[in-house]
Amino acid sequence: DLRSLRLMSDRMLSMNTVRDTTMVVVKPDATRTGQAYIYYRDINGSYTLETLEGVNPHWQGDYGKVLFTYFPPGNKAFEGQDVHLFGELTQFAGDAASRMQFNEERGAYEKTLFLKQGFYNYNYVTLPQNKKGFPDFSLTEGNYWGTENTYIVLVYYRPFGARADELIGYTTLSSFFQRPGF
């Protein structure tokens, strides 16, 4: 929650202004693997530009350097794996811009990003160092089958002789509201 650069949110550890730059340190995260599943309301890895001090966050929002810290189990680097910040704030990419660096002294992965004021939702994922494979949440976030996701279903039709598909229907489904008892 980076909507204010005057007041610290519950996820901020510290906030300092150095010269013309606001430095924000997010509270360190640890592995959630093996912990009981807890539903956290989220925005599925997205972000929204918002500011509590202005009317229009696109014009009046400020920027800050934000330090993210992830402590792996035993404070040891994952063998053969890189840890990445994963979400819309890194364009869901597993590249050098999202890769966290392991700090041997602290025993933690760290990454600093220059972000505009807003609300950011993200996860930590691992990717093989050989760059082949898919993001894996199980080492960092745990693997919980009962999580909430949003799906968009698009139905296309291509008439005989046509050169392009036509969108004839769409719907949005949320797995959270499909489960009994919710």
Annotate each language-model stretch with its function.
Residues 4, 9, 14, 46, ...:
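Generic serine detector
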Residues 1-38:
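Long, internal scaffold/assembly segments composed of regular secondary structure
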Residues 67-117, 129-159:
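Aromatic-rich carbohydrate-binding modules that target alpha-glucans
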Residues 24-81, 167-182:
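Basic K/R-rich, polyanion-interacting modules in nucleoproteins and related proteins
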Residues 52, 60, 140-142, 151-174:
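Compositionally biased Ser/Thr/Gly- and acidic/asparagine-rich
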